[in-house]
Amino acid sequence: MKSVIIIALLWCAIPRAVLAQDEDSLRIDVKGFVDTYHAMRVERPNDWMSSRSRVRGEVTLEKGHAGAFVSANLIYNAILKDRTGFQLREAYAYYSDDHWDVRAGRQIITWGVADALRLTDIISPMDYTEFLAQDYDDIRIPVGGLRLRYSREKWNLEAVAIPVSSFFDLPTDDRNPWSIGPVPIGDEPKHRLYNMEYGGRLSFFLSGIDFSFSALHTWNKQPVLCNGVGEYHRMTMLGADMSVPVGKFVVRGEVAEYLDELQTGGSRAASTNALLGLDWYAGNDWTLSAQYAHKYVALGEHRNTGLSTLRISKDLLHNTLALQTFAYIDVTNGGVFNRLSADYALNDQLHAILGYDLFHADSGMFAIYKKNSELWVKLKYSF
């Protein structure tokens, strides 16, 4: 713990930005944050659900059109001891000019227009070590690969290649309050060229509408139980998304067809995934957002499942206090996970956040966590 604190102080002592005087010289930018997060179960035995502190450092080196970006964490986790230590987040080299944008290395790749739901956005897997009781950006796992994008005024074309796939991080240790149990997970695909992921996305930005088409040859990133063992298999995703502003509203839509997707039990079948979302910027610092995602699997008895989200946020006290509720609603089984938070900015760098996570479910995806409702507090200092 002492070494983590010392390195944290060193990070904070580094100047936030060092800028060269001419464009052809090397430019260096250093920034990051220190945060600490603690959560307690509201039901008996009122134990700690999470207790972790972190230093995040981000360094950008740039000269001309080329550069490199590295972000890393130093973590102390009082509950999950194996999570304590150094964690490389992203590390990639890039080249960017008026039309070309190339990134090679460990990076987070996002597709689609869905908010905290995965339809076409299936390249970067998820860290479910604490399920969804983390910031969504922290849940994404970077992948090592190449991303090439060519942009024009009204469209761009993106191609991706991931030689070695990354997969969901699932909590199976009983010492973790978020454990799903001792589920055996099969071997990940061998590191061979024929197992690489590849795909592309074509996006258009027109007056009154943005839309895109995407395709990806990939794997099921979350293991599927087959004869009691979690397995990974090949699948292909074909998708499209759109976003349309209408006055104070934004209408979002997304659809993804998963071809030859592995189903529970080992069968393979196509599945259709569709989402409709509506954002309302109501004025007076109010924002409301609702989504409904539906999945149809062309196999078995339970072919249809539905999941909704609802986000409501309001800024108060000259935008120093941000109130928000974000809920996942299991339409199929009636469960809900609702994260409420109050974020108060003590100054431009220091934030204090108080929150409550509510789980309520008798069956379905949230039932395993029905006793995990928690009260949490977070402090964050940015530098």
Feature-to-residue mapping (PLM):
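Residue-level signature of outer-membrane beta-barrel architecture
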Residues: D22, I28, V59-K63, Y94-D97, ...
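Transmembrane beta-barrel strands of outer-membrane/channel proteins
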Residues: G32-H38, V70-L74, A104-R106, A159-P163, ...
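Hydrophobic, lipid-facing positions within transmembrane beta-strands of outer-membrane proteins
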Residues: S51-G57, L88-A91, P142-L146, M196-G200, ...
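Outer membrane beta-barrel
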Residues: T60-P177, S207, A361
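Repeated loop/turn-to-beta-strand initiation elements of outer-membrane beta-barrel proteins
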Residues: H65-V70, W100-V102, K154-L157, G208-F211, ...
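Detector for outer-membrane/organellar transmembrane beta-barrel domains
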Residues: S243-I329
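Outer-membrane beta-barrel "beta-signal"
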Residues: I312, Y356, K371-F383
